[in-house]
Amino acid sequence: MSDKFKLLLKQIHFPQHEEAYNEIKSGSIESVKLFKSKRQWFFVFSFRNLLSYETFTLFDNLLHSSFDSLGAKVSYMINVEDISCDQSLLEAYFSYALDILKSSHFSIYSLFSNLGIEISNNSISVKAPAHILRENLHERFIALIADVLSNVGLSNVSISVLEDKEASSSLEEAYETNKISLQEEAESQARQALQSIVQSSPVPPPQKHQAQNFAEKQSQRVASFDKAEITPMIEVNSEENRIVFEGYIFDVEQRETKTGRIIINFKVTDYTSSFAMQRWVKDSEELVKFGMIKKGNWVRVRGRIENNPFTHSLTMNVQDIKEISHTPRKDLMPEGQKRVEFHAHTNMSTMDAIPTVEELIDTAAFWGHPAVAITDHANVQSFPHGYHKAKKAGIKAIFGLEANLVEDKVPIVYNSENLELKEATYVVFDVETTGLSAVHNDLIQIAASKMHKGNIVEQFDEFIDPGYPLSAFTTELTGITDNHVKGAKPLVQVLQEFQEFCKGAVLVAHNATFDVGFMNANYERHQLPTISQPVIDTLEFARNLYPEYKRHGLGPLTKRFGVALDHHHMANYDAEATGRLLFIFIKDVFEKHGLTNLEQLNTELVSDDSYKKSRVKHATLYVQNQTGLKNIFKLVSLSNVSYFEGVARIPRKVLDEYREGIIVGSACADGEVFDTLLSHGIDKAVEVAKYYDFIEVMPPAIYAPLIAKDLIKDEGAIEQLIRDLIEVANRLDKPVLATGNVHYINPEDAIYREIIVRALGQGAMINRPIGKEENAQPAPLPEAHFRTTNEMLDEFAFLGKDLAYEIVVANTQAMANQIEEVEVVKKDLYTPYIDRAEEQVAEMTYAKAFELYGNPLPDIIDLRIEKELSSILGNGFAVIYLASQMLVNRSNERGYLVGSRGSVGSSFVATMIGITEVNPMPPHYLCPKCQHSEFITDGSYGSGFDLPDKECSECGTEYKKDGQDIPFETFLGFDGDKVPDIDLNFSGDDQPSAHLDVRDIFGEQYAFRAGTVGTVADRTAYGFVKGYERDYNKFYRDAEVDRLAMGVAGVKRNTGQHPGGIVVIPNYMDVYDFTPVQYPADDVTAAWQTTHFNFHDIDENVLKLDILGHDDPTMIRKLQDLSGIDPKDIRADDPDVMKLFSGTEVLGVTPEQIGTSTGVLGIPEFGTNFVRGMVEETHPTTFAELLQLSGLSHGTDVWLGNAQDLIKEGIATLKTVIGCRDDIMVYLMHAGLDPKMAFTIMERVRKGMWLKISEEERNGYIQAMRENNVPDWYIESCGKIKYMFPKAHAAAYVMMALRVAYFKVHHPIYYYCAYFSIRAKAFELKTMSAGLDAVKARMEDIKEKRQRNEATNLENDLFTTLEIVNEMLERGFTFGQLDLYKSQATEFLIEGDTLIPPFIALEGLGENVAKQLVAAREEGEFLSKTELRKRGGLSSTLVERLDEMGILGNMPEDNQLSLFDDFF
């Protein structure tokens, strides 16, 4: 005890009795401060241990009372060396903190004082209702409590506030109930007041009519509701009473409270905004009155707008609601006079359009349009769905796309001549203009430098007055002001002088097509000769000379080559800089390629892939007939596979090659006809338009963004452009089609596209900012909704009625009539051809059957094979079976087992030829010596593995046992004609080889990965909406955010590939008969091409093999390699293995040691928390019961709320509940139902259709079931099921799981080695090697984080690993440290009873580095850390980590030893 502290204790009269004084005397005063003016003292005390609560309160009371008696104040803070404390002490200190809070912050105290508190292990958890969390009041509470506890020495206590969902629900219900009771009370008081007024008033004379009854009052209320003024939702931003809205319900959720009341939460939009609404309903009877509250309905609602304390947003509490009719937009033109839309995008246009193809076609059909075209950007992924939908809707679908057309080779030199590059004279020029259109904009500066052999010999620089003030945009971009151009020479004079300046020279410009185009347009306008001398485009020169550069603009090039460019976008500076670059290029092209002549630049420098840098122009391509469909498929494939560069491109020569059967339209403002017209005028546009079959014109509103971009002056100019486009078509006698460039259906949907497009960021061309700095904004998006005929005619009314009708209706109908109906998706299955496939399958089947069951075969086997082969061979499925057998056999030969998935195990033929290990026959005995067999067909056993052991009645050999009792019908349907879906689980290590096997068997040109289309997910859509809200200064209430996110979700974002699916095209056809192809995610370096269509769209037409990678076969292979035990020799009924499912004794541990009451941790199929819980509830003892569990765990609404309740209530057992789909058919047939009906019932139940079929059909099934004594609980259970797992799939999984479990029981060190090498996802070596206490402590730490929802994904994975680590340690095995010379790269190493971890188990050390490290140590010992970093490929951080763990021992930093070290 310090002297100062001893003196303090004496002054406050601290009693020196033994217990308290002995505890506190270890203290000392670290510091003390005195604030004289406030008479306030502040102490910092230090104690070795935390004071007991009794000693602390005694000290605290004496300290405060002593200073109070002196008229002074005191406060303090305590520091403690050892801050550990037990639960009771922490509870006491927490109570003290609450008391302090009560006196200082009563409002916070009152909220938290009566809440549930959980205290343990230096952590305090408080459960609070949701509104406290939403108001962030818990953060203030945590801070205050933590401050108090820290001051008394408890600085390490973790405090968290979690939501008490039960309390939240009860409070919300109480809140609503209280509101209702208050309302009723107020109404009662009003009635009483009214009654007293009436009683005190004189009696009125008799009236002719009696007072209104309740029904009349209600009628008046309804009438007032019907006539009430409708308020737009956007106008309501605060609490209000009796507001009336009308809108569309887009989301509904209802739930029942504990008291039986029902709350209906729904969301409504009127497309100005959206509101969350709720209606409380007393019971299910009253709920019927509110049947109109369902998604998709339009309603009128009246209610109070209140700030909901639980959602923290404005919510309408609905008082009145009624369904209203809503009339969607209609096409009012008479039948036969309706347009055809020829330019429409669906949500398959990547991040650009909203409607599904079904919505587009439905709208066109509803309007009575005879046809509608699909023209997505550069893809045809909506074709299959569009094809099926159009057939269903009775409308012609026109299949097309908006392609990216590029020139094959873009020249460097125009008007080329035979000139030596080093000897020529060049005029390097640049122009500045008021816009990008040579027709609609004007020249304001021409500047040039005449250069010879790198030197400037003369310059030209003239401004030109356009005759009107320059726009702010022009001045901002070019730096040219009205003062520059005012009083300048006339344009014609400048043009003449410039022509004279250029005589005898080669012209040079950067992006010469623009500058030359502008000059020629002005020359023509003033009857001057156009440019005829050679022109070098330095942009294309740079692209071909430096293809490795990503950017070839003037700015980036001058920076790269150190050329000055002081005022970019002023012509004189740009021209001089371009000239300097030209002579650098001339020098480099000679040194790199030996080129000296102007003509050589085009013939020898322009590369074959110059299309990659060529400017993309849009063109619309349409399928005219079946030949055209295949050619479109080829074009899409080539554009994605051979010509992809940023986007899928189609070179003009490629389009020419495959143009048969295709109609080509001129597309939108990004098409070359429109661009040429805008830039060069009608004559040039006519030349370009010759390539196209028709010319598109679009509503002026579609072109309106060009005004914002300063490409067009005003709406009048847009109308003139449309007239000019029609003139172009008329000169060529080509039809003009008015198209809408549709990107969404209704005008109010524009916001969805706005959000999607802006989510692309400013890097996207469509979002390029106009203006600079704070004025920079992207151009507005056009009004691109689907227009009716009337709306379209109105858009073109300025052309006159007849011309408008011609381009809107007559021409579009005529063009649609030229297009034939095509078959996009074929009707039949086309399997590849393998020679003698049918014979091979039959021969292999019978050969194996004879080997196992003898010849002649037992009748039950013979009939089953005959039945299956009849279906398999008769429907052309033999090749599917044979291909699967070949793949499995090849993997087996490489040493891997292959697990089957799905229902293939229902086929006995599949079993016989080696596709699956699952035997679907009824449970049976089979003699391995004499082939005698006994079948159990009465349903008494669910699996042959559960039969009691028995010796052969013929020869005395112990029988083998097999058979899972699975009908063949569950695989290929009752009539055996369903396309077989054979899914196989290959080892993840062997999967790549299995994929290559498919190519080897069928040919590379016939095997493709199954393609997928990735769309905007719900959470991503929500993020897009919030991002738009942030970036564009919007504010949306929560319901509106939800509505917008729903509108945005589903838009195509990318493409990908199925993890294991491979599509096989028949070798007598080609892939373009079915689908285009591409690379996944546009990765042209990928090893495999994929189907362009989502594979589900063609899975009934071509063979799809699911060759999936799975851990189970890899694990089995690892265990076989470690033990030498053949996994096929492991019995499925090992009694010790079965004990894992009922306890832990077989592992030699107690439940308390491993934290679970069974031994299934880490066992495939049974090791998850969910299934472990099922195992603990049911304690399965047979293989059949394990199959049940597998089915129950994989199904939907099969266990929870169904079988689980039946078992708990003693109504059924694990054996008798419905587990797998096949069990239904087998059970019902054993009960006496007709097999066909049993099969149909199974199909209805497994797909969740039981309650969706007609009542008449369902009652027929129920009657048949009851007549055959099927219990009611079974029938009711059928009605709850949404999805069921195939028994064959369950059997395959359980067989694999039991093999793994065998090693866990009998060869544990092998099991743990395999588990950690293959299945574990996260490691923490420091913890794993520190022993049981450290492992258990870390697990508790993660558990606490989970309770607070603070655990990371990595920690959750680590917890799973640590569960197995804990079990392994409890069983007496240990983890060693990483060893620089023993550890493997990726797999654990067994050393006695110890596992040595691999290098990848170290955080931050990846597989490639681990392999490099192992390879490096083979070359020799690491003599220093420096050498370890260099040869081993380790970062400094990893070397430091290894050193900290003691793995490097005394390894020096470097190995530059002194000369004398070798003597010691």
Swiss-Prot record:
Family in the record: Belongs to the DNA polymerase type-C family. PolC subfamily.
Nucleotidyltransferase listed as a keyword: yes
Main location: cytoplasm
Pfam family for this entry, one: PHP
Protein name per Swiss-Prot or TrEMBL: DNA polymerase III PolC-type
Residues annotated as signal peptide: none
Entry-linked CDD domains: DEDDh (cd06127), PHP_PolIIIA_POLC (cd07435), polC_OBF (cd04484)
HAMAP family (alphabetical): DNApol_PolC
Catalysed reaction equations from the record: DNA(n) + a 2'-deoxyribonucleoside 5'-triphosphate = DNA(n+1) + diphosphate
Recorded name of the encoding gene: polC
UniProt cross-references to InterPro entries, sorted A to Z: DNA_pol3_alpha_NTPase_dom (IPR011708), DNA_pol3_finger (IPR040982), DNA_PolC-like_N_II (IPR024754), DNA_PolC-type_N_I (IPR028112), DnaE2/DnaE/PolC (IPR004805), DNAPol_HHH (IPR029460), DnaQ (IPR006054), Exonuclease_RNaseT/DNA_pol3 (IPR013520)
GO biological processes: DNA-templated DNA replication
Compartments, record wording: Cytoplasm
EC number(s) given by UniProt: 2.7.7.7
Keyword Nucleotidyltransferase (UniProt): yes
GO CC annotation, single: cytoplasm
Limits of the Exonuclease domain: 426-582
Highest taxon of source: Bacteria
Organism: Streptococcus thermophilus (strain CNRZ 1066)
Role played: Required for replicative DNA synthesis. This DNA polymerase also exhibits 3' to 5' exonuclease activity.
Single GO MF descriptor: DNA-directed DNA polymerase activity
Keywords linked to the UniProt accession: Cytoplasm, DNA replication, DNA-directed DNA polymerase, Exonuclease, Hydrolase, Nuclease, Nucleotidyltransferase, Transferase
